[in-house]
Amino acid sequence: MNKNSPELHPIGVFDSGVGGLTVVRALMERLPFENILYFGDTARVPYGVKSVETINAYARQITEFLLRQEVKLLIIACNTMAAVARQSVESLSPVPVLDVIDAGARRAVAETRTHSVGVIGTPTTINSNAYARAICRLAPETRIFSQACALLVPLVEEGWLDHPVTRLTAQEYLRPVLAEHIDTLVLGCTHYPLLKALLQDVAGPDIHLVDSAEAMADATAELLQVQHLTNPERIPPEYRFYVTDVPLRFQQIGERFLGRSLPGVERVQL
């Protein structure tokens, strides 16, 4: 096959930091022969405190960089960018664009039986109402109960994945959501899959957790098949990682998110 065939081109995944590596991990497991290129804007994280105009400008810069790498698909693995900048990305991109919010919302609608869905995420994501809007577009009858969980991201990055402090914090955050008798809980932050076992334990066995990273991987597999973009080669894929800064403990945190060693990371300037 011609090396310029679109099927052989990489999937481009981007985030403001390291959280999107949970999406890369899910893609590696779901699509083991796909080449993947990851971009983390680690010099300018967090995006949540930035203006809408700034986030859109950053998203356009990243999109242009990834398109120069000849990606066949763009995945917005950052909830903040997905909530604010998807239209900016789509307006620039000649290739398909997917995002974690849409994937998580679709999975939640498919899974809920009582039309009562909880959503947890960072304050920025929750305040944007992006998940609620996406779910309501798909199923207007759904009752949605959202909860901002400001402390979970730093606890994950500290590595306290099953720490008593993390468990107590999760219990406090989930209490009002669980009181609404939801049957489905969306993990609306790419850090949260690392807390999946703890959150399931706190929520109880009757609550279905929607892992937006897994949902994103499934949506990607479906799109590649429909658009005939699946890589037909059965050889070890190439993974490339780009960042705008290599902050303290980046390697350690990145490997925790990816679930394997993080190969050579290249620092770039936009």
Curated annotation (Swiss-Prot):
Keyword field contains Membrane: no
Keyword Isomerase applies: yes
Cross-referenced InterPro entries: Asp/Glu/hydantoin_racemase (IPR015942), Asp/Glu_race (IPR001920), Asp/Glu_racemase_AS_2 (IPR033134), Glu_race (IPR004391)
Catalytic residue positions: C78, C189
EC assignment: 5.1.1.3
Residue positions binding substrate: D15, S16, Y47, G48, N79, T80, T190, H191
GO biological process, one term: peptidoglycan biosynthetic process
Catalytically driven reaction(s): L-glutamate = D-glutamate
GO molecular function: glutamate racemase activity
Pathway(s) it belongs to: Cell wall biogenesis; peptidoglycan biosynthesis
Keywords: Cell shape, Cell wall biogenesis/degradation, Isomerase, Peptidoglycan synthesis
UniProt xrefs under NCBIfam families: glut_race
Family, similarity comment: Belongs to the aspartate/glutamate racemases family.
PANTHER family in UniProt: GLUTAMATE RACEMASE
Function: Provides the (R)-glutamate required for cell wall biosynthesis.
Protein name listed in UniProt: Glutamate racemase
Organism: Syntrophus aciditrophicus (strain SB)
